[in-house]
From Swiss-Prot:
This is 3-dehydroquinate dehydratase. Keywords: Amino-acid biosynthesis, Aromatic amino acid biosynthesis, Lyase, Schiff base. Involved in the third step of the chorismate pathway, which leads to the biosynthesis of aromatic amino acids. Catalyzes the cis-dehydration of 3-dehydroquinate (DHQ) and introduces the first double bond of the aromatic ring to yield 3-dehydroshikimate. Belongs to the type-I 3-dehydroquinase family. Pfam families: DHquinase_I.
């Protein structure tokens, strides 16, 4: 399976990489959060732009992205506008969403963008191509905060992301039962062993699903989300604890 290299970070080999989310509402919040994150042990910084109040003004967004890059200079920056329908804070039209991601790509300030699978195939394909022309990697994502689809459906969505050109397909689902967590892990193994030719990221959310955030190296998920201060999704654990567990599993 091929790995994905972003700056000097190789995703898809060794222990799963740790992603943390920055969620400031104003440029002042963004800067203070970035400063607070500087000493934390993580691999990729995700900026959750849907938390940023002034998201429809490209200048403000790019000013904030520049501020993050000045403060955290040594980590890849993942630019993510999570839509309201997939658990995010704000709603944009498809046109606004694509334009925002293209502006981020154009800026040269971000290393990766997150594109939601169900944005529309044509828009997604074109935006993936655009990102790749500018040497920006794409995490393609899907989130279900209500349930865990059947394993076949999870695999199908991950394969679709791969077909649409994602560098890293990602899915997060909500378990209603312990068996749902096994469904997600089963789908992860099947995708990783039978279909994936690139790294994937999967997780089962909430406290019930926390094992999926820790055992990625065993089942085939290449990255996991941790919390520095406030969790960006249910079930995230602190980055320090996360690194300890990932290292134990890696060295076992």
């Amino acid at each position: 399976m091929k790995t994905v290299t972003v700056r000097d970070l190789v995703v898809g080999e060794g222990a799963p990489k740790i992603i943390v989310s920055l969620m400031g509402k104003t440029i002042t919040d963004v800067k203070s959060e970035a400063l607070a994150y500087r000493e934390a042990d993580f691999d990729i910084l995700e900026w959750r732009v849907d938390h940023f109040a002034n998201v429809t003004t490209a200048e403000s967004v790019l000013e904030a992205a520049g501020a993050i890059q000045e403060i955290i200079t040594d980590k890849p920056l993942l630019f993510t506008f999570r839509s309201a329908k997939e658990g995010g804070e704000q709603a944009l039209t498809t046109g606004q969403y694509i334009a925002l991601n293209r502006a981020a790509v154009d800026s040269g300030l971000v290393d990766m963008i997150d594109l939601e699978l169900f944005t529309g195939d044509d828009e997604v394909k074109a935006t993936v191509g655009y990102a790749h022309q500018h040497n920006v990697a794409v995490i393609m994502s899907n989130h279900d905060f209500h349930k865990t689809p059947a394993a076949e459906e999870i695999v199908q969505r991950l394969r679709k992301m791969q077909e649409l050109g994602a560098d890293i397909p990602k899915i997060a689902v909500m378990p209603q039962t312990k068996a749902d967590v096994l469904t997600l892990l089963t789908a992860t193994v099947e995708m990783q062993e039978r279909y994936a030719d690139r790294p994937i990221i999967t997780m089962s959310m909430s406290k019930t699903g926390v094992i999926s955030r820790l055992a990625g190296e065993v089942f085939g998920s290449a990255a996991t989300f941790g919390a520095v201060k406030k969790a960006s999704a249910p079930g995230q654990i602190s980055v320090a604890d996360l690194r300890t567990v990932l290292t134990i599993l890696h060295q076992a």
